[in-house]
């Protein structure tokens, strides 16, 4: 009996496409998805009993591996005395204090329930603070399913081949300007044309939602310069790369200070969580201190705060975790490139710490959305199915990142490379 198929087919009767997030349907790779039953460390198991080495990690959050003992214990302990109050708790203070005291450029922070909430709230705050309306986002970057961001977006929008999004009025995107990632001149031209109306720039400082694309430090410095010149705010979307490429996130890669930063994924320890923070003078514009209103019934939920606190504290106290992830990430990157060269495969590998994407393209480098779109989707599909059959859970999309955890070992990387060696292209 194929339990995966049975469960997924029944799911399609009750959930659109059988899923609660489109990429999980595996539509772009043409098969039914495995239905996951359990996970521990770097491994997951599906309903048919198949085990996989997991390089998806819930799309990034599980940097400590699945069911980390300290995170599980924190959740259990908190759930015995609290689930939700809709009121202030000591746990939300503990996590906020830890974040503000150990992260750069975060004087104050506001907890929310998702990355989408964090980014849309940060943009609202930027508009309220500057009294301007227009926001620059970059083609291929994904900042959640907020209407104003669903234009030339990455992630599932790109994976599913959706040119736009039905239900998003033209009015909702009229104040969204599209920049080209790593193109200084084009962004400068946007400011020359619209500068007095631009409230801010939102950017993934390491893009992960069109696959991993690194930001040129010179480009980032230009963004800071333009924001300062025109009185706009620079917003780093670190939903994916925060606590992942380094404890302090991608900010550590640039000699540039953002005005606002958004977080989610890792900081929730695997539970629904998000946050945005920044300079005190900006954050104090939020209600109840200022006129920018944002609220949430479940924001600062005690169980979520306990999972986040256990995760963030463990990462802060163990900097060697990042050394380990860098070591195995480098081994994976070098090994894949050596095999591809030997086989004559057109391949670009982009990696930052524990985020990595294999782009099947004949280009020499991938540094923007247009480069990403040159990739061979059919070859990626063959690669994906090959690796899945070899026991590896990797993203079912050319346009997503693979992730590494502290529970991945060099042996796991060796097995990945052995499997990739047998891929015929």
Swiss-Prot record:
Pfam families with a match to the protein in the record: Aminotran_3
Domain of life: Bacteria
First-tier enzyme category under EC: isomerase
Signal peptide stretch: none
Residue positions where N6-(pyridoxal phosphate)lysine is found in the record: 265
InterPro entries the record matches: 4pyrrol_synth_GluAld_NH2Trfase, Aminotrans_3, Aminotrans_3_PPA_site, PyrdxlP-dep_Trfase, PyrdxlP-dep_Trfase_major, PyrdxlP-dep_Trfase_small
Pathway the protein acts in: Porphyrin-containing compound metabolism; protoporphyrin-IX biosynthesis; 5-aminolevulinate from L-glutamyl-tRNA(Glu): step 2/2
Keywords: Cytoplasm, Isomerase, Porphyrin biosynthesis, Pyridoxal phosphate
GO cellular component, one term: cytoplasm
Family as reported in the entry's similarity comment: Belongs to the class-III pyridoxal-phosphate-dependent aminotransferase family. HemL subfamily.
Alphabetical list of NCBIfam families matching this protein: hemL (TIGR00713), PRK00062.1 (NF000818)
Protein name in the entry: Glutamate-1-semialdehyde 2,1-aminomutase
Source organism per UniProt: Clostridium perfringens (strain 13 / Type A)
Lineage: Bacteria, Bacillati, Bacillota, Clostridia, Eubacteriales
């Amino acid at each position: 009996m194929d339990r995966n198929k049975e469960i997924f087919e029944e799911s399609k009767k009750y959930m659109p496409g059988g899923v609660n997030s489109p990429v999980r349907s595996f539509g772009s790779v043409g098969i039914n998805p495995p239905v996951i039953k359990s996970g521990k460390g770097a491994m997951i198991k599906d309903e048919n009993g198949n085990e996989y080495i997991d390089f998806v990690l819930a799309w990034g959050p599980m940097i400590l591996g699945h069911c980390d003992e300290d995170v599980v214990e924190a959740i259990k302990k908190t759930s015995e005395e609290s689930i939700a109050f809709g009121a202030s708790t000591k746990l939300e203070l503990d996590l906020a204090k830890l974040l503000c005291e150990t992260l750069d450029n975060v004087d104050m922070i506001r907890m929310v329930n998702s990355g989408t909430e964090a980014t849309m709230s940060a943009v609202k705050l930027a508009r309220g603070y500057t009294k301007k309306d227009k926001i620059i986002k970059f083609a291929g970057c994904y900042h959640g399913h907020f209407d104003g961001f669903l234009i030339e977006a990455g992630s599932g929008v790109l994976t599913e081949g959706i040119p736009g999004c039905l239900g998003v009025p033209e009015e909702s995107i009229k104040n969204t300007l599209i920049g080209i990632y790593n193109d200084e001149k084009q962004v400068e031209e946007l400011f020359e044309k619209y500068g007095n109306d631009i409230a801010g720039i939102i950017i993934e400082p390491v893009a992960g939602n069109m696959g991993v694309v690194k930001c040129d430090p010179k480009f980032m410095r230009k963004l800071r310069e333009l924001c300062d010149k025109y009185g706009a705010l620079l917003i780093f979307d670190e939903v994916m790369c925060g606590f992942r490429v380094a404890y302090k996130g991608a900010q550590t890669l640039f000699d540039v200070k953002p005005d606002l930063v958004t977080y989610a994924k890792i900081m929730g320890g695997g539970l629904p969580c998000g946050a945005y923070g920044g300079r005190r003078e900006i954050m104090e514009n939020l209600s109840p201190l200022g006129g920018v209103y944002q609220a949430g019934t479940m924001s600062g939920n005690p169980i979520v705060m306990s999972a986040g606190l256990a995760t963030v504290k463990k990462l802060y106290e163990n900097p060697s975790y990042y050394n380990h992830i860098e070591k195995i990430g480098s081994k994976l990157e070098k090994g894949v490139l050596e095999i591809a060269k030997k086989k004559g495969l057109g391949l670009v590998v982009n990696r930052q710490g524990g985020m990595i994407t294999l782009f099947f393209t004949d280009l020499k480098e991938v540094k923007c959305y247009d480069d990403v779109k040159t990739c061979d989707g059919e070859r990626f599909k063959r690669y994906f199915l090959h690796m899945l059959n070899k026991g590896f859970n990797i993203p079912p999309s050319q346009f997503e990142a693979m992730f590494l955890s502290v529970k991945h070992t060099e042996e796991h990387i060796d097995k990945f490379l052995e499997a990739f060696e047998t891929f015929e292209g």
